[in-house]
């Protein structure tokens, strides 16, 4: 879960690399480093912590090299410190790496036997010494080919050589890597987002490929060293400006943007004239699909779980939901009439991509729901449904989660209608209600003051629980995850009906418990479960929707009301106060809300 950048140019590159690393910090921010090459001398600087600290380093300010590589790190092997920060170097070779080398211990033993001395605790350093060892007898290209064949695991690499003053080598297996093209300079980066400020012309390396980048041309090779021709893709535009504006944090801005991003997504999929949902170029006949498997990680998994309830409520399709890291290692019974849907904000989630690759190897029907349409998951899927929510910078997903749920719900309505699971009138009624969603979310955002007031009870607690039934259960899971991610408070989401089967033992006097009890078919049962935790001393924060009827329950600590809507849309509205709760809890504790500890936005390692 690191980010790499490389630039071969005819002018100094250090400031451009630093700016690109700032855009890659969503991939990791434990440490950062840069190396540039000029007149046969490699200048290198590293820092623990953010790129801002690296930028202030006097070595960086004096770098004049026109060839350079940079790195932001999320630690996998070795503690996050300057010694373990990238680049890692020998006398002649400097490497930046995203991924995990699974056989690093074996390779290190071999290299130590050859007299190599290791300085760090990282797996990356074996790559440096392998290349150095093979360069004793082989030319550069041969040494790269031999090195890559020795590595087990995943990697995206940027490599410079003291005695090769005009080039960068890039290579990938399992981790994404892109090449960008500019005037008198070319670029290497973990993804298009890192390169968009410099170019909108990009090529992507496939698994096992490597490239040699110079300022005026780029060559691509397969794992045997044979030349590969690459298409140059022109992205829709250069970098989209995105800053915090008047908000203190990106997350706060992204929460407030949700009415606009939902409206934008609805406009992309719903025809304004006939109110029909348009999913263009859907590649399969609906009669060829009898079941669906939804696959994701973290927040994306929660959106998949939410969609399962919608599919089962509105269609006759059989639906399974799986965590990508579990799906990819099980003995799966692949079915030709099953549609596999992969959900990922970044489109680069390693386990989700591996699950997709497994399905592609078995010639399955694959569809992806992503925010980044140039991503690996999008490129390798048969069909892509973008969520159209714009850049999301905060590590804890907010508007992307809403966008994932929205696109999944739109797909539910379209497939349900095509299968004639409901009539046209019902279909049009549901779309009519859907178009009201942005305004409903906008109105629900006004609950801010009460959420701010209750958040202190969560920051002081040893732990908390989030309970829901039916449609509300996936949202309870998401609410608990957000509190864990941002406020570092232990929180668990449970089906409300499961409390008597063990979790009730954890309830103690004063423990905050969030109960999601919208006035749906499960309302009365959920209120009964709420009473059970109140009876054992819990402080219950009830979140329900507005109604003329009062909640008949005593000793509720606080109640937050969201707007009313049909049952399908209530999960969107219940999500908003949970996002705010996590935000204000973290704010009270003074934590870094946009970049919580130990986490990264794009999870590109297993």
Predicted regions and their residues:
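Active-site phosphate/pyrophosphate-binding segments
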Residues: 258-262, 266-293, 383-512, 586-606
